From Swiss-Prot:
Protein name: Translation initiation factor IF-3
Record has Protein biosynthesis as a keyword: yes
Function in brief: IF-3 binds to the 30S ribosomal subunit and shifts the equilibrium between 70S ribosomes and their 50S and 30S subunits in favor of the free subunits, thus enhancing the availability of 30S subunits on which protein synthesis initiation begins.
Predominant location category: cytoplasm
Family: Belongs to the IF-3 family.
Organism, scientific name: Pseudomonas fluorescens (strain ATCC BAA-477 / NRRL B-23932 / Pf-5)
GO-annotated cellular components: cytosol; membrane
Gene: infC
Compartment list: Cytoplasm
Gene3D superfamilies in the record: Translation initiation factor 3 (IF-3), C-terminal domain, Translation initiation factor 3 (IF-3), N-terminal domain
Pfam family for this entry, one: IF3_C
Keywords, comma-separated and alphabetical: Cytoplasm, Initiation factor, Protein biosynthesis
Coiled coil: none
Length: 183
């Protein structure tokens, strides 16, 4: 026997607050539509006040004794909340880690091109991972790689700061540079 379930149902948002007749408490601490404290009233009185204002009675805090309820337009408050979440999500910037690879024998022209790319990454607000790969006998001259990474660090001083100092990982020397905070 196969039981089919509607998968969209499982992706429901947070449980909705009880409104109007769905509030189970006998008396509630009521907050008016304009935010003023009305006080502790019976649920029938609170529903009457909400109905007179042509608004909903929404349970805000069920944990309090008695529960806190507010007179408000429930549909409008949900819309405003969704709008705030969307605006916050839109304003978030995903920080990426961009990688530039060097070799111990990187020539001056290549060095300048790679440095320009690092400056661009840091200016865009991304973190930059500088990796220096050793091959074969180059492992015997790790100090050359350290000098190169120190030079990169010095050249990028005004654009970013070292987040992770150079360290060996297998045959690679890796350093991470974070962008300077914009004022």
């Amino acid at each position: 026997m196969i039981i089919k379930r509607d998968m969209r149902q499982d992706k429901r948002a947070a449980p909705k607050a009880p409104i109007n007749e769905n509030i189970s408490a006998r008396e509630v601490r009521l907050i008016g539509a304009d935010g003023e404290q009305i006080g502790i009233v019976s649920i029938d009185e609170a529903l009457r006040i909400a109905e007179e204002a042509k608004l909903d009675l929404v349970e805000i805090s069920a944990d309090a004794v008695p529960p806190v309820c507010r007179v408000m337009d429930y549909g409008k408050s949900i819309f405003e909340k969704k709008k705030q979440i969307a605006a916050a999500k839109k304003n978030q910037k995903q920080i990426q880690v961009k990688e530039i690879k060097f070799r111990p024998g990187t020539e001056e022209g290549d060095y300048q091109v790679k440095l320009r790319n690092l400056v661009r990454f840091l200016s865009d607000g991304d973190r930059a991972k500088v990796s220096l790969r050793f091959r074969g006998r180059e492992m015997a001259h790790q100090e050359l790689g350290m000098e190169l990474l120190k030079r990169v660090e010095a050249d990028l001083q005004e654009y970013g700061s070292v987040e992770q100092h150079p360290k060996m990982e297998g045959r690679q020397l890796i350093m991470v540079i974070a962008p300077k905070k914009k004022k």
